[in-house]
């Protein structure tokens, strides 16, 4: 004769307090990000906008727009950095590849001109006056 307890009845709770037959984790609800078709968190973006006190009031479309812009910029940057790492036959994106991606792209370089990426290095560049002349 065994002393194990039978499984809880349908709709009951198990020992940990969770409902029986229901998986823990994400339920696949209809959050703002899912409605907008974004990966970046719209709700968190809105909370940070309000907590930052950038304005007295924040419209309901502002977090969606900001999350979309942030998602686009990070996707663009990761794509360019991934291309740079692939060109150098590496499988990992390092700060060096992020720097190469930003500085070789005209628009990103203009946008991030005042940004220093830690451990990123600089673009390789040798001035023409320092090179030896071929005629002599």
UniProtKB/Swiss-Prot annotation:
GO cellular component terms given for this protein: nucleosome; nucleus
GO molecular function: DNA binding; protein heterodimerization activity; structural constituent of chromatin
Subcellular location: Nucleus; Chromosome
First-listed, main subcellular location of the protein, grouped into a coarse class: nucleus
Superkingdom assignment: Eukaryota
Pfam annotation, one family: Histone
Keywords: Chromosome, DNA-binding, Nucleosome core, Nucleus
Listed InterPro entries: Histone-fold, Histone_H2A, Histone_H2A/H2B/H3, Histone_H2A_C, Histone_H2A_CS
Region (Disordered): 1-38
Assembly and binders: The nucleosome is a histone octamer containing two molecules each of H2A, H2B, H3 and H4 assembled in one H3-H4 heterotetramer and two H2A-H2B heterodimers. The octamer wraps approximately 147 bp of DNA.
Protein family: Belongs to the histone H2A family.
Function: Core component of nucleosome. Nucleosomes wrap and compact DNA into chromatin, limiting DNA accessibility to the cellular machineries which require DNA as a template. Histones thereby play a central role in transcription regulation, DNA repair, DNA replication and chromosomal stability. DNA accessibility is regulated via a complex set of post-translational modifications of histones, also called histone code, and nucleosome remodeling.
Protein name: Histone H2A
């Amino acid at each position: 004769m065994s002393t194990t307890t039978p499984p809880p009845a349908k709709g009951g709770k198990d020992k940990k307090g969770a409902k029986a037959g229901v998986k823990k984790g994400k339920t696949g609800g209809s959050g703002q990000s899912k409605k907008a078709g974004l990966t970046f968190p719209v709700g968190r973006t809105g909370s940070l906008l309000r907590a930052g006190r950038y304005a007295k009031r924040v419209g309901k479309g502002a977090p969606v727009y900001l999350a979309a812009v942030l998602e686009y910029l990070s996707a663009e940057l990761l794509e360019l950095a991934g291309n740079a790492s692939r060109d150098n036959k590496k499988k990992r994106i390092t700060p060096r590849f992020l720097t190469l991606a930003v500085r070789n792209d005209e628009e990103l370089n203009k946008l991030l001109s005042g940004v220093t990426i830690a451990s990123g290095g600089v673009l390789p560049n040798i001035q023409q006056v320092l090179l030896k002349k071929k005629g002599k």
